[in-house]
Design a protein with these regions (language model features):
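Short beta-strand elements in bilobed, periplasmic/extracellular small-molecule ligand-binding domains
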Residues: 1, 60, 106-128
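Short beta-strand scaffold positions
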Residues: 16-17, 38, 148
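Flexible loop/hinge segments that line or gate small-molecule binding clefts
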Residues: 37-67
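Short, well-structured alpha-helical segments in soluble
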Residues: 1-14, 25, 130-145
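Venus flytrap/periplasmic-binding-protein-like
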Residues: 35-48, 161-177
Length: 177
């Protein structure tokens, strides 16, 4: 509803959507009149926000697409750490898998020969307690590295982040985000 109200205004020259959910909300009610700039999206192609790296598919929409962003990051993390089992937590939904860069992680794991240990028990809240439980489960499965995706429980402003990082530190599990 807010996205629709924004795009109906006549006094705006540009609307900026911050994050995948906001951009999807704007595009769902796009009237083609006001330019829309999408920012802060993990993977616009995988999220279905754009058609390709070359063409958004929407005349009044633009965003940056960094091809192979996550694949490159997973490769560098592996090259530096040489782990065997990388843990990933996510919400069991299409969006959750996109935010976790699961497709890229699976491809790189197969290419480089490491295993993914997955925890898909997060709700959309991604609370500290849910993430603590997820980390415990991943640790039991032998995780020796952890990918911190864009999860609420690891948000820099969230008070629950420090105990989660302390837990990973105690286990001597290297991380990257």
């Amino acid at each position: 509803e807010l996205a629709k109200q924004l795009l109906q205004r006549k006094d705006l020259d540009l609307v900026v959507g911050m994050g995948t959910a906001a951009v999807k909300a704007l595009l769902a009610v796009n009237d083609g009149r006001t330019p829309i700039l999408g920012m802060g999206m993990a993977d616009p192609i995988a999220a279905g926000v754009v058609k390709s790296a070359e063409d958004s598919g929407v005349d009044n929409f633009t965003c940056r697409v960094e091809v192979d962003r996550w694949s490159s990051m997973f490769r560098v993390f592996y090259d530096v750490v040489r782990f065997h089992k990388m843990g990933i937590m996510f919400q069991n939904s299409q969006e959750g898998r996109v935010y976790a860069a699961l497709g890229d992680a699976q491809a790189i794991a197969s290419e480089l020969g490491f295993t993914l240990v997955l925890y898909d028990g997060l709700s959309s809240a991604e609370s500290t307690e849910e993430c603590r439980k997820g980390l415990d489960e991943l640790h039991k499965k032998g995780m020796d590295a952890f990918f911190i995706g864009p999860l609420n429980c690891f948000d820099i402003g969230d008070a629950g982040m420090a105990p989660l990082l302390q837990k990973l530190n105690q286990w001597k599990v290297p991380t990257f985000a």
